[in-house]
């Protein structure tokens, strides 16, 4: 999205860069593209993060520390391992609350806030929002009974909540902004904190000092269209896999050629090729949920 803004809205992009430098606009997500989290290979996922972080460093002089995927249709057991090995500390989504049926006991997700353990035993913090698509009314959130009840479910007495316009894009609605502002000034039983997407994770580092955090060791699955989208548009998935294999072969050949003093490693060419098809690993593209 930032690359598109850079190309088509250069004036607004420069204004945004100024806000980032002033600490008024915060980056999140770490990746080049808001990827699907099940079809792409591990190599694709790691390169997606690498390219995203390179872009953040080059354009803004900062890096992201989290995986931010509010709208994907399930999350594989490898994701905490990949994120941890990329130096990331947390992951958030809200999509699992859109499930039709409970899957983790009586709940649609294992917990609201805790640790998610990957296949190699490494862990990141998992924060799951609730009530997919919910918007706040123009009221004092510090008095919100639902927030109070949800926070009470966790050992940290905390709830993580997105706010904004959602699928149709754009900034938070005026009513949502006013509700947060009233909550920040409010004196109710709920303390409202306006924070970046990764602040929660940073506040509880190192995680080993918080044995009260629940641990989930497994996949985060999605029903509704989250099942069919991994079999639909099979040709697109075939081309994606062919691109991944070609990217791996090109990397090996290029490195070997440089080792043998036969050619200079074409780093920018390889990166641009990966960007072109990682762009199509977007969670509403590769999954076949868009035209």
For the regions a language model picked out, list residue spans one by one.
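Catalytic-domain carbohydrate-binding cleft regions of carbohydrate-active enzymes
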Residues: 1, 5-291
């Amino acid at each position: 999205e930032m690359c598109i803004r850079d190309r088509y809205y250069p004036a607004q992009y420069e204004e945004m860069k100024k806000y980032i430098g002033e600490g008024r606009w915060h980056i999140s997500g770490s990746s080049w593209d808001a990827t699907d989290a099940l079809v792409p290979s591990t190599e694709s996922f790691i390169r997606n993060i690498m390219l995203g972080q390179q872009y953040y460093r080059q354009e803004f002089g900062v890096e992201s520390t989290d995986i931010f995927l509010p709208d994907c249709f399930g999350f594989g057991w490898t994701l905490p391992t990949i994120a941890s090995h990329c130096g990331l500390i947390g992951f958030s989504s809200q999509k699992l609350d859109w499930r039709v049926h409970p899957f983790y006991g009586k709940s649609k997700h294992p917990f609201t806030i805790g640790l998610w353990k990957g296949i190699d035993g490494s862990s990141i913090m998992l924060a799951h929002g609730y009530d997919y698509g919910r918007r706040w009314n123009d009221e004092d959130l510090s008095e919100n009974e639902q927030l109070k009840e949800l926070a009470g479910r966790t050992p940290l007495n905390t709830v993580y909540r997105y706010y904004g316009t959602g699928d149709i894009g754009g900034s938070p609605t005026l009513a949502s902004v006013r509700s947060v502002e009233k909550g920040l000034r409010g004196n109710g039983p709920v303390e409202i904190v306006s924070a970046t997407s990764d602040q929660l994770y940073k506040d509880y580092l190192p995680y080993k000092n918080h044995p009260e955090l629940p641990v989930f060791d497994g996949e985060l699955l999605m029903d509704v269209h989250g099942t069919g989208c991994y079999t639909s548009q099979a040709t697109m998935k075939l081309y994606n896999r062919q691109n991944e294999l070609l990217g791996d072969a090109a990397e090996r050949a290029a490195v070997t050629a440089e080792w043998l003093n036969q050619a200079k490693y074409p780093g920018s060419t390889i990166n641009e090729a990966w960007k072109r098809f990682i762009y199509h690993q977007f969670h509403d593209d590769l999954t076949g949920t868009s035209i």
